[in-house]
Design a protein with these regions (language model features):
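N-terminal Rossmann NAD(P)H-binding glycine-rich loop of SDR-like oxidoreductase domains
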Residues: 9-17
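Conserved NAD(P)H cofactor-binding loop of Rossmann-fold oxidoreductase domains
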Residues: 73-79
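Substrate-binding pocket helix/loop in short-chain dehydrogenase/reductase
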Residues: 81-82, 89-92
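Active-site helix of classical SDR
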Residues: 105, 141
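Residue(s) in the substrate-gating loop at a strand-loop-helix junction
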Residues: 125
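Active-site loop-to-helix junction immediately N-terminal to the catalytic Tyr of the SDR YXXXK motif
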Residues: 131-139, 151
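C-terminal helical subdomain
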Residues: 163, 167, 180-220
Length: 243
């Protein structure tokens, strides 16, 4: 088997790569990323394909057509008041966080329209499901991605296919380097394993720490979205000021 991890040079994508490298059934693991694959984790199974998702060109996919699993983990976001956001930032955010995943999934979609297993997991974000002030652009990109996945999974179901796209929507994750720190795969290894497990079961939604944290958070949001948003605003503002 062969897998492709988009965004596999860092964060949760790197953890997924390392997990798959440990599985005998995977003979090759393609990594698409703007950043080089870390030399520290060099492995003969890894095929690194440089690609900048912000430019709208996906020629690199042609070198990874023979895959059986697809994990899309690339994405970025920054705490910003909307008045501080530039037009280029908005464009790049949607290009990387939303348009690229849709285009990549479309490239491999014929594999999903099959009786054979094709595994697909996509990192979204809990920010796409809640009011997220100071993360307005990021949450918008992820909300669009979430709704796309929901709709396509319905299409697959009604058309009689077993394959699904797993939406993974976590909150803040330690060890991913999302906020600028280094990637620490050992901190996200358990999560990576669970993402792979659920993807291979063709599940549709996984919210890590749902019972412990996000069940209550979502309930608060649904009870009074504006009140929740105001509380989120002040919480994020304190985080921004602490940097």
């Amino acid at each position: 088997m062969r897998a492709l991890i988009v965004g596999g040079s860092s964060g949760i994508g790197l953890s997924i790569v390392l997990n798959l490298l440990g599985k005998e059934k995977y003979e090759s693991v393609y990594v698409i990323d703007k950043a080089p694959f870390p030399e520290k984790y060099a492995n003969d199974k890894v095929v690194y394909l440089p690609c900048d998702l912000s430019n709208g060109k996906y020629d690199c996919l042609e070198r990874a057509n023979d895959i059986h699993a697809l994990y899309i983990t690339a994405g970025f976001g920054h705490l910003k008041f909307f008045q501080e956001v530039s037009g280029d930032y908005i464009q790049n955010s949607f290009s990387v966080n939303t348009v690229a995943p849709l285009q990549i999934i479309r490239h491999y979609y014929d594999r999903m329209l099959s009786a054979e297993d094709f595994y697909c997991g996509v990192m979204v974000s809990i920010a796409g499901r809640l009011a997220s002030p100071l993360f307005s652009v990021y949450s918008a990109t992820k909300a669009a991605l979430s709704k796309f996945i929901e709709a396509v999974n319905v299409e697959l179901d009604v058309q009689g296919y077993k394959n699904r796209i797993l939406e993974v929507s976590p909150g803040s994750l330690k060890g991913t380097g999302f906020s600028g720190g280094p990637s620490q795969p050992e901190l996200t290894a358990t999560l990576a394993d669970e993402i792979i497990r659920r993807t291979e079961l063709h599940e549709e939604l996984y919210i890590p720490q749902y019972e412990d944290i996000f069940k209550g958070v979502i309930a608060r949001y649904e009870a009074d979205a504006h009140k929740y948003g105001v509380e989120s605003y002040w919480y994020k503002k304190k985080r921004l000021e602490a940097k």
